[in-house]
Structure formats: C-alpha cells, structure tokens
C-alpha cells in the first residue's frame, strides 16, 4: 500500500518494510496517477530499485486531497477559533457519503465553549458525533477506539486542531501544530502533503490538507440526482413527494420540506442542501468527467 508520495517517488509498505518506488511509464501514458492509499503490486530489482507495476481496483478515492480506499472520514470542527461553518461541514459530509465513506464529526476545543447546537444538528441527521479536548485529553479514547483496522482520513479547516488530536491519539507522531494567527483568525497550514500514518493502536490515519476550498463545481463533484442521497436523514422521505422530479427545495407536496416543518430534519441541514443544489443543478453530464 502506498503510504506517501513526494517528488515523483512513492513509498510502499509491504511485508513490514517500506520501499521507495517509481511508477512505470505506462501510468503516465494512460493518465493514471497513483494515490496514497492505493494497493499496488511492485517489483524489486537486484540493485534495489523498485517500481509500481499495477494499481489494484480502488473502492473509493478523493481528488483533492489525492487519497484512496478510505474507510471513514473524521471531520474535525472546532467550537471556536475558527468558528464552525455549517455549509463547509455539510459539503464535506456529502462528499464522503457520495464516495461511500463513513463520515464522523469530532468537535474539538470543547474545554473553551459549548457545542450543544452542533450536536443537535448532526445527531438528528444520524451522523456519528464525538466531542474532544486535545488540551485535557477528554474524549480522545473514544476516537482511538474507532481506528484499528481502518484507513481514516482526518480533515477540517486550518486551525481546528487536527494535528493536536492526532498527537493525542498517538504521541509518537509528533505532528507540527499551527497556532491561530491573531490577525487573521486562522491557523497556519501545517499539513503540506497527504501521508498515511501507521497508528500504534492499529489502522492508518491520513492527515490531509484542509477542506476550506472544497467546491462542488470543481474537484469532488456530486451529480444533481445523487445529492439527496448524500443527506442520510432525507432517505425516509425520498420517493414519496407529490412530484417525481421534486428537487426538495421549494415544491408543494415535498415530503422533505414537510419533514423540515415537522422538525424531523434540521433547518440548517436543509439550507445547506439547497445551497449545494444551486451549485450543481446546471452542471451537465460531460462536465462531470
């Protein structure tokens, strides 16, 4: 499995060793780029040079950041400094749902401020929700228990405490952490490349660049017809609207809108859905390529 890629070299873990490999030219010719997380077949020559010969089928992948075969995505959200942005949270969850990746929300810095509203929104949506404080260690054991045997991508905006959380999960990692800029109110980008980190308790963590620039019109695109299925709390109401072509944004007889009125779906989540629908509704099939 590729655990890191940098400068045209790919570092492949196999049989408890790490091999520095180059990708065969055939991959460039066919437009295939090896991703961190790819399971690959490699060859080892007599002079110890190694090459990636084959990339095995991926169960999923992200384009930005380039990482594949993810089991779960832990989205770290801070209660303050920086404040949570529901639309960015919901876009990230939707991308995970569309790719078949289990989304998990971890709220950080809970020693500084309450998080009741966030908890209400996402527990109502059926999204696994955890609260931690990297400063005190509260809640970290629960996150550690989620990781063995899985590839977990850790993501979130700059400054939310991803690296601090990973350092708490496995102190051997000693990841650089970024202090919040007092002037900008944002953290320095301390994660410069995607790398799979082998965890002491089992499993791998992908510490990925922040998702602050995620855009459904570029990179991780979701088809208009798939978007409702990326909001798992919509599922009981899909297919029962008055009109088969219902967009679930404003139509009369929409079961999703009725569920929002009945407080079975949180208004914040529906607002995010409507904003995302506006972004994708006019994208043509050929633009998805």
Which positions does each model-derived feature cover?
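A short macromolecule-binding patch
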Residues: 18-24
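Short aromatic-glycine-enriched beta-strand elements
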Residues: 8-12
């Amino acid at each position: 499995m590729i655990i890191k890629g940098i400068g045209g070299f790919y570092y492949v873990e196999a049989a408890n060793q790490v091999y520095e490999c180059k990708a065969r030219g055939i991959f460039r010719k066919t437009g295939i780029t090896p991703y961190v997380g790819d399971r690959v077949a490699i060859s080892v020559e007599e002079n110890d040079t190694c090459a990636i010969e084959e990339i095995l089928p991926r169960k999923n992948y992200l384009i930005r950041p380039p990482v594949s075969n993810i089991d779960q995505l832990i989205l770290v959200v801070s209660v303050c400094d920086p404040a949570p942005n529901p639309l960015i949270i919901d876009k990230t969850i939707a991308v995970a749902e569309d790719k078949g990746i289990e989304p998990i929300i971890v709220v950080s810095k809970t020693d500084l401020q309450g998080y009741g509203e966030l908890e209400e929104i996402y527990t109502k949506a059926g999204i696994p929700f955890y609260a931690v404080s990297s400063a005190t260690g509260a809640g970290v054991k629960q996150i550690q228990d989620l990781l063995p045997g899985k590839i977990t991508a850790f993501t979130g905006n700059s400054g939310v405490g991803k690296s601090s959380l990973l350092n708490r999960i496995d102190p051997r990692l000693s990841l650089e952490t970024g202090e919040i800029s007092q002037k900008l109110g944002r953290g320095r980008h301390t994660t410069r490349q995607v790398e799979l980190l082998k965890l002491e308790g089992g499993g791998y963590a992908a510490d990925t660049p922040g998702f602050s620039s995620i855009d459904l019109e570029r990179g991780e695109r979701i088809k208009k017809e798939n978007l409702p299925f990326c909001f798992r709390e919509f599922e009981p109401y899909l297919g029962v609207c008055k009109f088969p072509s219902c967009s679930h944004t404003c139509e009369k007889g929409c079961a999703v809108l009725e569920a929002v009125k009945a407080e079975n779906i949180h208004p914040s989540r529906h607002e995010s859905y409507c904003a995302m629908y506006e972004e994708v509704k006019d994208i043509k099939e050929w633009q998805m390529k």
